[in-house]
UniProtKB/Swiss-Prot annotation:
<dbReference type="GO" id="GO:0006298">
    <property type="term" value="P:mismatch repair"/>
</dbReference>
<comment type="function">
    <text>This protein is involved in the repair of mismatches in DNA. It is required for dam-dependent methyl-directed DNA mismatch repair. May act as a 'molecular matchmaker', a protein that promotes the formation of a stable complex between two or more DNA-binding proteins in an ATP-dependent manner without itself being part of a final effector complex.</text>
</comment>
<keyword id="KW-0227">DNA damage</keyword>
<protein>
    <recommendedName>
        <fullName>DNA mismatch repair protein MutL</fullName>
    </recommendedName>
</protein>
<comment type="similarity">
    <text>Belongs to the DNA mismatch repair MutL/HexB family.</text>
</comment>
<dbReference type="InterPro" id="IPR002099">
    <property type="entry name" value="MutL/Mlh/PMS"/>
</dbReference>
<dbReference type="InterPro" id="IPR014721">
    <property type="entry name" value="Ribsml_uS5_D2-typ_fold_subgr"/>
</dbReference>
<dbReference type="GO" id="GO:0140664">
    <property type="term" value="F:ATP-dependent DNA damage sensor activity"/>
</dbReference>
<dbReference type="InterPro" id="IPR014762">
    <property type="entry name" value="DNA_mismatch_repair_CS"/>
</dbReference>
<dbReference type="GO" id="GO:0005524">
    <property type="term" value="F:ATP binding"/>
</dbReference>
<dbReference type="InterPro" id="IPR020568">
    <property type="entry name" value="Ribosomal_Su5_D2-typ_SF"/>
</dbReference>
<dbReference type="Pfam" id="PF08676">
    <property type="entry name" value="MutL_C"/>
</dbReference>
<dbReference type="InterPro" id="IPR042121">
    <property type="entry name" value="MutL_C_regsub"/>
</dbReference>
<dbReference type="Pfam" id="PF01119">
    <property type="entry name" value="DNA_mis_repair"/>
</dbReference>
<dbReference type="InterPro" id="IPR020667">
    <property type="entry name" value="DNA_mismatch_repair_MutL"/>
</dbReference>
<dbReference type="InterPro" id="IPR038973">
    <property type="entry name" value="MutL/Mlh/Pms-like"/>
</dbReference>
<dbReference type="InterPro" id="IPR013507">
    <property type="entry name" value="DNA_mismatch_S5_2-like"/>
</dbReference>
């Protein structure tokens, strides 16, 4: 079969297969074109999930009549001249309009600010019409009907009308988040109309736009992010650890204003929240990365959803460091949604069940000598020392535990000082003054305007964990000498990498040295790890260093060991505390970054405002 050139219509349909995957892809391309044209008002209307109709209207600069034929021709653009690595616009290939016109019925109507009237061109299945004059407002209107009529096989892969409409909404919201000064309107027969009014482009305006898109709960539980490293700037907001979602769809990332779904950024977010989130929960973020266009390649994927950074390690480190710094600076803070969940749990049911509940209540006064079932206590009853809450370590952990952390000092030292402070002064603290212990597991505290309930085990677990981590990372870890050195055979390049990081590995308790070509001799291992498969661990370290030029896997592993030690070494549920011990625990929480969640990501306390309590009793 002879080689021959493909017809233009086939070329455009192939390009459409790469760029136009579904109706949401069309909306993305058209809205990006409108923004590149300087639009301040963008309207999107759809029908049939975008398959029957997509209409995008903007008030941008418009297209002159003589350039309309070029606008629907392949690889014709006003956004790129010669340098593919200096891209400062959302679009640059000149493929969107011809690709859309090859698989649907496209109408392009436009008018420039200085023109007396507008002009229109249509493309039906790849066939362009002549340009004709029409009445038009300033800006551009693009209308797409019968999407994929020219490639009916693609229709079989479309989802339901509702799903396609939802995908369009998601695309518009993701773009709108990066352009708060632009007004967006979304309407159609397949959806509820949505309007996102323009707001200022400063931090407060961005936070309002975040509230419009993600919800006001996020705005109330977000931490500002602002960092810079070697010419790469990071701004935005990240949620506190106790405000999470069940999936990562609420993680928004932008590179030079372009919405992206980048694995490196997603991984950096996971790393920043590594020991702060429960399993299968995800943080809510809106991160904006700004850098020289020459330092990032956006020409990786036809849909421009993926990017490639010249220095990925720099970007990852910037994200992880900035989020962790924000979390540490947040102090003691719980999600506002926790109180709402508590209020819902307390809500009295309507109907027969409420009446039955009322009949069950005897109304008998409390004599003061009885003790409610389940137990609560503020009495100074005999109690074993808090140090006894920590069982002796076993299997070689005792020495490491003694070296890195004086566990008995976490609460008991502050307990002595706490007794000197007046109760009225404690009420003014963020977590207030301890009033009672309920079920020998929960501390009830009072602040000036709220009631705080603390899970004593989860809270103390975080305190012990943070102290252990600080001790571990502030000085070299204790190591144990092997009776017989372990010889590990490795590829030559892996052995070379490990030797190059020998000093770093020594801080973590490893003693490694070369043992001939392609071999490593391991003489010491961290005593905290006990007995491990040394060969497997060394190979994993070599792979980690090859991937990231660091040994993060071991640091994570040690952090997990610290978490396990903290769990076993913290106050247990069912442990009765004295008032001074409870107050000392609250003061330590206030002084410890990230104490709003335990190291498994569960909340350590819930705050219920006095106004919410009054609503429960019908006072408001």
């Amino acid at each position: 079969m002879p080689i021959r050139a493909l017809a233009d219509i086939i070329i455009n349909q192939i390009a459409a297969g790469e760029v136009i995957e579904r109706p949401a892809s069309v909306v993305k391309e058209l809205v990006e074109n409108a923004l590149d044209a300087g639009a301040k008002r963008i309207e999107v209307a759809t029908a049939g999930g975008g398959l029957n109709l997509i209409r995008v209207i903007d008030d941008g600069g418009g297209i002159p009549p003589e350039e309309l034929p070029l606008a629907v021709a392949r690889h014709c653009t006003s956004k790129l001249t010669s340098d593919i690595h200096d891209i400062r616009t959302l679009g640059f290939r000149g493929e969107a309009l011809p690709s859309i016109g090859s698989v649907g019925r496209l109408t392009l109507r436009s008018r420039t600010p200085d023109a007396d009237g507008g002009a229109e061109i249509t493309v039906d299945g790849g066939k362009a019409s002549a340009v004709k004059p029409v009445a038009a407002n300033r800006g551009t209107t693009v209308e797409v009907r019968d999407l994929f009529f020219a490639t009916p096989a693609r229709l079989k892969f479309m989802k339901s009308e509702r799903a396609e409409a939802a995908a369009i909404t998601e695309v518009v919201k993701r773009i709108a988040l990066a352009f708060p000064a632009v007004r967006f309107m979304l309407s159609g027969t397949d959806r509820t109309s949505t309007e996102l009014p323009a707001v200022s482009a400063d931090g407060d305006g961005l936070l309002r736009r975040l509230g419009q898109i993600i919800g006001k709960d996020f705005a109330e539980n977000a931490l500002p992010i602002d960092a810079e490293r070697e010419g790469v700037f990071l701004t935005g907001y990240a949620s506190i650890p106790s405000f999470t979602r069940g999936n990562a769809l609420a993680q928004f990332a932008y590179v030079n204003g372009r919405p992206v779904r980048d694995k490196l950024i997603a991984g950096a977010i996971r790393g920043a929240y590594m020991d702060a989130l429960p399993r299968d929960r995800h943080a809510v973020t809106a991160l904006f990365i700004s850098l020289d266009p020459a330092l990032v390649d956006v020409n990786v994927h036809p849909a421009k959803a993926d990017v490639r950074f010249r220095d990925p390690g720099l970007v990852r480190g910037l994200i992880v460091g900035a989020i962790r710094q924000a979390l540490e600076g947040a102090g003691v803070r719980a999600a506002t949604t926790g109180a709402a969940a508590m209020l819902q749990a307390f809500r009295v049911p309507e109907g027969p069940s409420r009446a039955n509940g009322a009949n069950d209540f005897t109304g008998r006064p409390f004599s003061g000598t009885e003790r409610p079932r389940g137990g609560w206590s503020m009495e100074l009853s005999p109690s074993r020392p808090l140090e006894d809450a920590f069982p002796p370590a076993a299997n070689g952990f005792a020495e490491a535990q003694q070296v890195v952390f004086d566990i008995g000092s976490v609460v008991s030292a502050d307990a002595r000082a706490g007794t000197l402070e007046a109760l009225s002064d404690l009420v003014g603290r963020p977590l207030g003054a301890a009033r009672a212990q309920v079920h020998e597991n929960y501390i009830v505290a009072q602040t000036e305007d709220s009631l705080v309930i603390v899970d004593q085990h989860a809270a103390h677990e975080r305190l012990v964990y943070e102290a252990l981590k600080d001790a571990i990372h502030s000085k070299p870890l204790p190591s144990q000498m092997l009776l017989m050195p372990e010889i590990v055979d490795l590829p030559e390049e892996d052995a070379e990498r490990l030797c190059a990081h020998a000093e770093f590995l020594a801080r973590l308790g490893f003693g490694v040295e070369r043992f001939g070509p392609g071999a490593i001799c391991v003489r010491e291992t961290p005593s905290m790890l006990g007995e491990v498969d040394i060969a497997a661990l060394i190979r994993d370290l070599a792979d980690e260093i090859a991937d990231n030029d660091t040994a993060n896997s071991l640091k994570k592993r040690i952090d997990h060991i610290a978490a396990t030690m903290a769990c076993h070494g913290s106050i247990r549920s069912g442990r009765r505390l004295k008032p001074e011990e409870m107050n000392a625990l609250l003061r330590q929480m206030e002084a410890t970054p990230g104490s709003g969640t335990c190291n498994h990501g569960r909340p350590t306390y819930i705050e219920l405002k006095l106004a919410d309590i009054e609503r429960l009793f019908g006072r408001r």
